[in-house]
Curated annotation (Swiss-Prot):
Positions contributing to Ca(2+) 1 binding: D21, D23, D25, C27, E32
Alphabetical keyword list: Acetylation, Calcium, Metal-binding, Methylation, Repeat
Originating organism: Medicago sativa
Similarity remark: Belongs to the calmodulin family.
Organismal lineage: Eukaryota, Viridiplantae, Streptophyta, Embryophyta, Tracheophyta
InterPro entries recorded: CALM/Myosin/TropC-like, EF-hand-dom_pair, EF_Hand_1_Ca_BS, EF_hand_dom
Residues annotated for Ca(2+) 4 binding in this entry: D130, D132, D134, Q136, E141
Molecular-function GO term, any one: calcium ion binding
Residue pairs linked by disulfide bridges in the UniProt entry: none
Positions annotated to bind Ca(2+) 3: D94, D96, N98, E105
Protein name: Calmodulin
GO cellular component: myosin II complex
Entry-linked SUPFAM superfamilies: EF-hand (SSF47473)
Length: 149
């Protein structure tokens, strides 16, 4: 399934994987998964984290390695219930729930994920998605960007 991904997608997923793989050992543990999810405002139980890992842990060693992560991402991209996932993701970014993602909100989430971005980089991300030029990202613009990935 992962063989249907482009080189660009694989390199983006490698970057995402390294955000989760806090100690850089090539495996995502339940602890690391929990850290990232909590930084995004989620509060999964230990059992839920274990279930998430087990879902993709092909070799049964209790962690997710990069090939397993790629398969998960490839499956997720095929998912038909992505509409709900997109709404959920938008809500994570839209801290004040006003229907828009501001530069400050984008910076906040990216910082929580361990991505230190300059103001220019954040502004560039906003500009790329900001079709109507109002300086923030509405849901339609967010969906366009996410679907283009």
């Amino acid at each position: 399934m992962a063989d249907q991904l482009t080189d660009e997608q694989i390199s983006e997923f490698k970057e995402a994987f390294s955000l989760f793989d806090k100690d850089g050992d090539g495996c995502i543990t339940t602890k690391e998964l929990g850290t990232v999810m909590r930084s995004l405002g989620q509060n999964p139980t230990e059992a839920e984290l274990q279930d998430m890992i087990n879902e993709v842990d092909a070799d049964g060693n209790g962690t997710i390695d990069f090939p397993e992560f790629l398969n998960l991402m490839a499956r997720k991209m095929k998912d038909t219930d992505s509409e709900e996932e997109l709404k959920e993701a938008f809500r994570v970014f839209d801290k004040d729930q006003n229907g828009f993602i501001s530069a400050a909100e984008l910076r906040h989430v990216m910082t929580n994920l361990g991505e230190k971005l300059t103001d220019e980089e954040v502004d560039e991300m906003i500009r790329e998605a900001d079709v109507d030029g109002d300086g923030q990202i509405n849901y339609e613009e967010f969906v366009k960007v996410m679907m283009a990935k």
